[in-house]
């Protein structure tokens, strides 16, 4: 994971260290008031994929612009080679690709899974910015709304009630 708009610079520095990396880029037409230009822009903002040995991880983390590795319990998570191959195919095609991280939609029934509100269920009423959502929690005699991060909720299955 990189600082915003630092993907190309980070990818170049990793390449200088002779460590294999992949920055999925997509060609897109950018329009200014006076001209149009075809530019290459990262397909997934703030991500550079690195095929690093354990000894290289610290070296990569020290690169200016690198924020962190995707990790679980402090250990970097490997991305399956098949997924990287699929990204390479997408980037090599002429298809216009749009990346969406919104897995929730207005009206979804959700349950809070983290924090002091764990177990509360409600209806998602707004998907906001920065991975936040607003949910309406219906309790007897009350109608509450709560701002909460998307990683603190789960979508209820169709057979689950609020």
Indicate residue ranges for each PLM-predicted region.
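A generic structural signal for beta-strand entry/edge sites
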Residues: 130-132
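Short beta-strand-centered aromatic/proline hotspots
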Residues: 120-126
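Acidic-enriched and Gly/Ser
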Residues: 1-109, 124, 134-162
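Short coil-to-beta-strand transition motifs
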Residues: 113-120
